[in-house]
């Protein structure tokens, strides 16, 4: 696991959408002087994020996703947010309004990610330095209303699929639903 690295492509996609997971999802590599890992900022940083396709090989070279430490998070066969994303996707493909289903999916996906982040914080204990504040339901709703809804209006299916991609990333440790999606 020491050869894993935080993804620059995921960081940049989360930043593009101003997604609240960005402030919680990544941690720096071990700071030996401070004896811990810090919550990584969402700004580009080659010491934290591995460049897509050209990472430098080595152990503990980059930061990692906080999801790596969510070992005791539940493994979901089918989560509520996945079900709502499937509904939103089907409605989009039928040319119908999917905004309500998409909002439920996005909010539930953010809160599920926060559950994994909280579990990871417990796993890391006080070795996680300056952790970012938790994603709240209010923040998740605001993210949808102020960011996602505008892109949904212009590109409903694309927005649904991107938000689904974000929500399935790290979904409770290992996600059966994501494996199924890839097949």
Q: PLM features: residue spans?
A:
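Conserved small/polar residues in nucleotide/adenosyl-binding loops
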Residues: 177-183
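Hydrophobic-face positions in mid-chain alpha helices that act as interaction patches
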Residues: 1-87, 93, 99-163, 167, ...
């Amino acid at each position: 696991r020491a050869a894993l690295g935080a993804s620059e492509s995921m960081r940049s996609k989360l930043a593009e959408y101003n997604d609240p997971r960005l402030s919680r999802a990544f941690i720096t590599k071990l700071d030996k002087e401070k004896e811990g890992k810090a919550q990584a900022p969402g700004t580009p940083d080659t010491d934290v994020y591995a460049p897509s396709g050209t990472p430098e090989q080595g152990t503990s070279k980059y930061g990692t996703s906080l999801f790596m430490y969510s070992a005791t998070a539940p493994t979901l066969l089918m989560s509520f947010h996945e079900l709502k994303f499937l509904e939103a996707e089907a409605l989009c493909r039928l040319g119908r309004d999917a905004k309500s289903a998409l909002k439920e999916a996005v909010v539930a996906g953010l809160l599920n990610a926060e559950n994994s982040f909280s579990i990871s914080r417990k796993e890391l204990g006080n070795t996680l330095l300056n952790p970012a504040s938790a994603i709240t339901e209010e923040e998740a709703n605001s993210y949808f209303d102020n960011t996602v809804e505008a892109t949904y209006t212009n590109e409903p299916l694309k927005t649904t699929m991107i938000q689904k991609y974000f929500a399935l990333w790290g979904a409770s440790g290992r996600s059966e639903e994501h494996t199924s999606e890839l097949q």
